[in-house]
Amino acid sequence: MPEVKVPELAESITEGTIAEWLKNVGDSVEKGEAILELETDKVNVEVVSEEAGVLSEQLASEGDTVEVGQAIAIIGEGSGNASKENSNDNTPQQNEETNNKKEETTNNSVDKAEVNQANDDNQQRINATPSARRYARENGVNLAEVSPKTNDVVRKEDIDKKQQAPASTQTTQQASAKEEKKYNQYPTKPVIREKMSRRKKTAAKKLLEVSNNTAMLTTFNEVDMTNVMELRKRKKEQFMKDHDGTKLGFMSFFTKASVAALKKYPEVNAEIDGDDMITKQYYDIGVAVSTDDGLLVPFVRDCDKKNFAEIEAEIANLAVKAREKKLGLDDMVNGSFTITNGGIFGSMMSTPIINGNQAAILGMHSIITRPIAIDQDTIENRPMMYIALSYDHRIIDGKEAVGFLKTIKELIENPEDLLLES
């Protein structure tokens, strides 16, 4: 019978975690229809069946890590089950599963891979996956004696664990003692221990890699936002009318300013590959977006060829896709430079961490009204923003980093020039 395998995703992605089965065992499946959602290091993707038929077996459970090319489901022939009345068209195995299924097992918390089997000795109903039930029969194991690890559903690995139990009892007891000692280190203090999501674990790993593998340094400057705020105030209503409701924000100004600065200082648009330095001739700018799953960085492509309205519309679209978990892998890879805005959370100053293999990242911050010396005799309150450029000192010299940030400052403080250049 045809197998559904984890498809090739992106060059850097070799595995994923099954987030949710979208089809139950016995359900009809159309060609090209999604049967499960896979969580990868970057985005969630739907895995589709290349054949029409019936989902006859799930070879992995929700929460399992699966590799690219691994078989995760089997598609059998038939039209599937719409209800118990249609079960006469199923295979004998499917009829057995349907007849033994508990009526109350309908809520979403139950693993979609589970089926029910009556124990021949005591008629007790046992929840088990089809592969586990078959494996138990082949090895003469009584499912009633197997302790399931997850969701009260017996799986193949639970049977293996039972068979290996005598040899591993001492090791298990030692491990349990270590765990107990670790948990009881502060017995009177409340703690919560939980596993990190795949995406958070990946982010933690990559952030540490950047910190360990780059000569990261941060330089700062400050920007007087008076002129750009006045320009935005004058233009925003007409801008929305002219561009189908698209709002004029600060991100488009900083994006266009970054493109101009990258052209002036191409080292900032580079990366190291072994002994080579690759200078990118394109301007795909990453914009950090905060979601419930953490920070994601989709890329606005070809920012040098887009106007302010196109950039603002694309940023808004990517933000919606990120929060609705609809970003594709194409949205998340092969960027050249990143902008992050900690100001939306109230950050006054920070040292952002370089994104992936890029050479630098620009940090925006809160706009704060502060007294500024205009000249020797005049002090005025001005809306000021600190900006930061974290950069890889292996590629970028301090002179170029300071010059880059100074270019950003000059363009934002003279936004009319930025508009003309666009």
UniProtKB/Swiss-Prot annotation:
This is Dihydrolipoyllysine-residue succinyltransferase component of 2-oxoglutarate dehydrogenase complex. Pathway: Amino-acid degradation; L-lysine degradation via saccharopine pathway; glutaryl-CoA from L-lysine: step 6/6. InterPro entries: 2-oxoA_DH_lipoyl-BS (IPR003016), 2-oxoacid_dehydrogenase (IPR050537), 2-oxoacid_DH_actylTfrase (IPR001078), Biotin_lipoyl (IPR000089), CAT-like_dom_sf (IPR023213), E3-bd_dom_sf (IPR036625), PSBD (IPR004167), Single_hybrid_motif (IPR011053). Forms a 24-polypeptide structural core with octahedral symmetry. Part of the 2-oxoglutarate dehydrogenase (OGDH) complex composed of E1 (2-oxoglutarate dehydrogenase), E2 (dihydrolipoamide succinyltransferase) and E3 (dihydrolipoamide dehydrogenase); the complex contains multiple copies of the three enzymatic components (E1, E2 and E3). It comes from Staphylococcus aureus (strain NCTC 8325 / PS 47). Residues 80-94, 116-130 have a biased composition (Polar residues). Residues 127-163 form the Peripheral subunit-binding (PSBD) domain. One of its GO terms (biological process) is tricarboxylic acid cycle. The active site is at 393, 397. GO terms for molecular function: dihydrolipoyllysine-residue succinyltransferase activity.
